Design a protein with these regions (language model features):
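Double-stranded DNA-binding cores of transcription factors and transposases
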Residues: 1-12, 17
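Residue-level signal for the short linker/turn that defines the boundary of a DNA-recognition helix
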Residues: 8-9, 55, 75, 242
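Mobile genetic element proteins and their domesticated derivatives, centered on retroelements
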Residues: 14, 24, 45, 60, ...
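Basic, flexible linker segments flanking DNA-binding modules
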Residues: 14, 21-122, 271-280
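Mobile-element integrase/transposase regions
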Residues: 74-144, 166-170, 177-184, 289, ...
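RNase H-like two-metal-ion nuclease catalytic core shared by retroviral integrases
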Residues: 101-103, 188-190, 196-200, 210-232, ...
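A short acidic/small-residue loop/turn micro-motif
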Residues: 147-148, 158-163
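C-terminal domain-tail junction helix/linker
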Residues: 204-208, 230-300
Length: 300
């Protein structure tokens, strides 16, 4: 307001408003502090967006807690969302589906062993699924194997077709990364790749029980569907991939970011690697999103 009346002295301006000069200066100092804090937050979020292009606002709020503590910033979740919106940093997720499952084959199909069962620790249940990844001239096919308890990606492979040999490569990687001695179930859809002789034999050679969906419903394998969606929609879709070699190199980096940095609601906003290695206890979550109490002396 003072800028609109430059001819009025500061002393007179303060008298008209009934405030002291100290109060006037304090007001502008506070505005400057708020502006500086907001710019710090925006810059930090932009940096995180380079690594996690479409990570949701709630998970960003969780990842930003150490930053808020370091800079003694006090901001609530809703205020952060408003700041993200004002700076064009909220994201809208795209949805598209291409079917990758062919269950019309003569290979043996196995029953669903996990209808009413949920793992109580890492490497008791692995879930597998395939999704597509677009490149400049064709679709590639991404096979992932994920630990259902920790949500850690154990094995992955990208290929130019849906031949069973490629899903077997993902399984071999998962077996190399196995670190806990426990009985293990492998759960997948009834696609030809997972029923193939080589794939089934590799599971049996490693004493892994075989479980499969029964009616093609994604709800029979929700964790695998979810993790595939995260890797594809939150990461790979935001790069202009040229070929399989480039996609595989990028995927290695993306999986590391996912395993070591990205928090999950379903594991109490911890990272998959932390839960997997330390066998942390997690609460299975259903329904509405929940955010645990985050200790930050600078927030309400």
């Amino acid at each position: 307001m003072k800028d609109s009346y430059p001819s009025i002295s500061l002393a007179r301006f303060c008298r008209l408003l009934g405030i002291t000069r100290q109060a006037f200066y304090q007001h502008y100092w506070n505005l400057e502090d708020i502006s500086t804090e907001e710019q710090l937050i925006v810059n930090e979020v932009k940096g995180l967006r380079q690594l996690h292009p479409v990570l949701g606002g709630r998970k960003l709020y969780c990842l930003l807690q150490p930053f808020f503590l370091e800079h003694q910033i006090k901001i609530g979740r809703d205020a952060l969302f408003d700041l993200l919106a004002a700076n064009g940093l909220l994201v809208r997720k795209r949805r598209r589906k291409i079917f990758t499952t062919n269950s019309k084959h003569w290979f043996k199909k196995y029953p669903n062993l996990i209808k009413t069962w949920y793992p109580q620790g890492p490497e008791q249940l692995w879930v597998a699924d395939i999704t597509y990844v677009p490149t400049a001239d064709r679709f590639l096919y991404l096979s992932l194997i994920t630990d259902a308890y920790s949500h850690r990606i154990m094995g992955y492979h990208i290929a130019e077709n849906l031949e069973a040999v490629h899903t077997t490569q993902a399984l071999k990687m998962a077996l190399m990364h196995r670190s806990h001695a426990s009985s293990l179930i492998h759960h997948s859809d009834r696609g030809l790749q997972y029923c193939s002789t080589d794939y089934v034999n590799l599971l049996k050679e490693n004493n892994i029980e075989i479980s499969m969906t029964e009616n093609g419903d994604p709800l029979e394998n929700p964790i695998a569907e979810r993790i595939n969606g995260i890797i594809k929609n939150e990461y790979l879709d935001h790069y202009k991939l040229k070929n399989q070699t480039q996609a595989m190199e990028l995927l290695s980096s993306v999986v590391d970011r996912y395993n070591y940095q990205r928090p999950h609601y379903s594991i109490n906003l911890q990272t998959p690697e932390l839960v997997h290695v330390n066998k942390l206890r997690v609460n299975k979550r259903w329904g509405k999103n929940q955010i645990p109490n985050i200790v930050n002396q600078y927030q309400d």
